Amino acid sequence: MKIDEITVEGYKSIKSLKNFKLNNINILIGANGVGKSNFISIFKMLNFMFSKNLQQHTQDKGPDSFLYYGRKTTEKIYLEFKFGNNGYSVTLALTQNNKLIVERENIKYYSSTEWINTLGTNMLESRLSQATKYAYSKKIAQYSLGGIKSWKLYHFHDTSDTSKIKGVCAENDNLILKPDASNISAYLKRLYSEHREYYDYIVYNISQIAPFFGGFIIRDSEIYN
């Protein structure tokens, strides 16, 4: 499900970004260090929260690295996502024992009024993946959960010699495209064989940037790149 708006406060280099509207395609343009990667990393953090690995994610680099200019300037992070008539918000707070915890977590529904259901407060880990257990309305929780689970983060910019996108993969590793694109060759071959219209659409869009591109080389092999 498409995200309509996002609000970010106190996260890394982002002091305050309120009700930022997102379209079907959004391009972030700016010099190195202005916060493009930090904006994308919000969704990486959300993935860790969903899998109950917030502490692992934040302790590796230290909670201060996630706060805007560290704890001397910022004590809390606030994230809010609006999608359709539904929403999700979370406040992360720094504790005295140097942990970033979930101070408050809500799922929301927007109609004539804003319906807010708090999933929990002052928790080491998020309850997002268990929203149907803690929400008053199971139906709204299921819908919100389904929307959030559909968001996938793909990070393809690594073009080094050790990049996984340049590695080999098994031909049958093609059900879903992995976030690091390590199985992109197998996935493209499946599109070519079973969903040609999507494959052709990819080739067409690449050719708009590189007119000389005519398609990928498709060959049969159990392991290939």
For every predicted segment, state its role:
Residues N86-I218:
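Electropositive, glycine-dotted interaction segments
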Residues S221-N225:
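Short, intrinsically disordered, charge-balanced linker/junction segments flanking boundaries
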